[in-house]
């Protein structure tokens, strides 16, 4: 059985379609590798790109794409709703078939070293490829974002510990090139589902409250003396925040479901929907960013479909309708479900 690995570079450009096309076209003709998805978001000013194929081909494609994005994107003029650290904010490798997490971590390390050496850009390793436990979470590495990077790399004031402050490879002092490129985080992880719940409000006041309630880390509260205590969140292995989507006139609870078996999409959706209802606001649908495992769709489909339905296609249809996945853009199952998209690409 041929090994297949997925790679999901997130680039910090979601508005200039011609620029996005130049970046993605740079890897369009690499043998053994297919581009499964290109999803730009103007509000986030970010594009999620999904590629999959033979490990050596995907690793080659990841380097070419990162190099092109570094050339094309100028972080000095970048603004968007989504947290980011550099021109390519994050680039994870995900084992799909016939490849181990350890092999994906080795791919991440080789790529991080190559990008730092050949592109002269600071790179961090995260997830299962992290060289320090404090760097496992992307959200930890990304604290302070691009705007805090200069102080972070210039021994200035920062919220980072010494263990997370400096990159694993590449320059460790701020310079003009880094001001343009920012830093890049490369790693390996299991399948993560990027899942956003649409909230019918123009600002993100309720979305932010919901995000702080559902995310696993919860929120800080203060007593009358000003002492702080962290209250855990509702959902398991979930990161979440509220953001505004000006282009659609709504807001979202933007989440990463780090283990979709422990927190299925319908659980996250119904939790957000109930909390929004408590504020007199509707959550009319949701959005998947990137690709999703078939099993995750089937699990949610079983919740929304009539009892006794077992056909995969019917369960997927029930999940799409129940979660409102086509509210913003049509959800095309053959292109968005990992197993189906890979089969389609291999057949071509």
Describe each model-derived feature in a short phrase.
Residues 1-348:
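Long, contiguous binding/interaction regions
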């Amino acid at each position: 059985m041929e090994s297949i690995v997925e790679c999901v570079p997130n680039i910090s450009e979601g508005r200039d379609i011609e620029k996005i096309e130049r970046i993605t076209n740079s890897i369009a003709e690499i043998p053994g590798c297919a581009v499964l998805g290109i999803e730009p978001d103007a509000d986030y000013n970010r594009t999620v790109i999904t590629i999959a194929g033979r490990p050596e081909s995907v690793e080659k494609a990841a380097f070419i794409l990162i190099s092109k994005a570094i050339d094309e994107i100028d972080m000095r003029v970048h603004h968007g709703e989504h947290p980011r650290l550099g021109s390519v904010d994050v680039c994870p490798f995900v084992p799909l078939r016939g490849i181990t997490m350890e092999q994906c971590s080795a791919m991440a390390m080789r790529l991080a070293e190559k990008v730092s050496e050949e592109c002269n850009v600071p790179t961090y390793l995260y997830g299962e490829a992290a060289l320090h436990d404090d760097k496992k979470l992307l959200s930890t590495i990304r604290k302070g974002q691009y705007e805090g990077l200069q102080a972070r790399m210039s021994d200035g004031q920062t919220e980072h510990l010494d263990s997370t402050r400096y990159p694993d490879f590449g320059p460790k002092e701020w310079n003009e090139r880094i001001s343009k490129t920012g830093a890049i985080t490369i790693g390996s992880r299991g399948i993560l589902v990027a899942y956003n719940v649409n909230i019918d409000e123009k600002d993100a006041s309720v979305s932010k409250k919901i995000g702080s309630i559902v995310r696993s880390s919860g929120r800080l509260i203060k007593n009358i003396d000003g002492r702080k205590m962290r209250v855990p969140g509702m959902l398991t292995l979930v990161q979440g925040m509220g953001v505004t989507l000006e282009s659609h006139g709504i807001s979202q609870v933007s989440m990463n479901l780090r283990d979709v078996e422990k927190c299925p999409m319908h659980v996250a959706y119904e939790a957000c929907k109930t909390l929004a209802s408590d504020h007199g606001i509707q959550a009319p649908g949701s959005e998947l960013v990137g690709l999703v495992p078939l099993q995750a769709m089937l699990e949610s489909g079983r919740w929304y479909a009539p009892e006794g339905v077992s056909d995969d296609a019917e369960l997927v249809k029930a999940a799409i309708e129940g979660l409102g996945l086509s509210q913003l853009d049509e959800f095309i199952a053959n292109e968005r479900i990992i197993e189906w998209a890979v089969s389609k690409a291999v057949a071509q």
